[in-house]
């Protein structure tokens, strides 16, 4: 099953067949629109003139990699920090998986092991790691035993709560609507807590 995110065909093709590009896109998916994050690996390929290997990125001069990330339009709003994270990611792939990014999931014997491996990558917090496991299962058919349990709640069938569920503009809209509702709920709770604190202070 190919990746079908709301990015151009070239970017989706790269994400679908190049595991390192998919990991980089997921890593960059923070504090910027997901369209920008998942287009960035294809932009990186264009700037380098070829698809980089993990070994190449691991060995890249850090300053030169930052310069490439910083070219306008920058690959991320924090190009220096993210270039460094991508390089750390590449080094882990080289050191722990013999340079084969796909081995992160193809050699995992269970969903729990897969989640542990993804969680050890830079930029993959608890939620993002579960989302990535869900994305692998839902969109690429990577389904070791227990993958759904390892990636709850993002693995639920028929859900529209993360990038793992985005396959077209309609699903993108549903996921964005869900996230907007979460933000509104969180904001309402914060206002309520503030009002309660004011009332408590007034009553003391």
Segments predicted by a language model, with ranges:
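Structural motif
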Residues: 10-21, 32-35, 76-81
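Alpha-helical ds-nucleic-acid-binding substructure associated with the helix-hairpin-helix region
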Residues: 48-119
């Amino acid at each position: 099953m190919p990746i079908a995110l709301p990015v151009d065909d070239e970017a989706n093709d790269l994400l679908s067949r190049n595991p390192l590009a998919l990991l980089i896109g997921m890593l960059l998916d923070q504090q910027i629109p997901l369209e920008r994050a998942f287009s960035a690996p294809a932009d990186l390929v264009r700037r380098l003139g070829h698809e980089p290997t993990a070994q190449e990125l691991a060995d890249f001069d850090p300053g030169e990699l930052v310069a490439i990330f910083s070219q306008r339009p920058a690959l991320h709003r924090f190009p220096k920090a993210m270039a460094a994270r991508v390089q750390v990611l590449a080094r882990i792939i080289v050191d722990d998986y013999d340079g084969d990014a796909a081995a992160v999931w193809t050699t995992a014997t269970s969903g729990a092991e897969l989640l542990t491996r993804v969680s050890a990558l830079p930029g993959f917090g608890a939620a993002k790691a579960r989302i990535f496991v869900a994305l692998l299962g839902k969109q690429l058919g990577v389904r070791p035993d227990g993958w759904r349990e390892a990636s709850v709640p993002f693995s639920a069938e028929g859900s529209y709560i993360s990038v793992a569920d985005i396959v077209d503009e309609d699903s993108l809209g549903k996921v964005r609507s869900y996230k907007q509702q979460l933000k509104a709920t969180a904001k309402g709770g914060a206002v309520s807590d503030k009002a309660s604190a004011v009332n408590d202070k007034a009553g003391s």
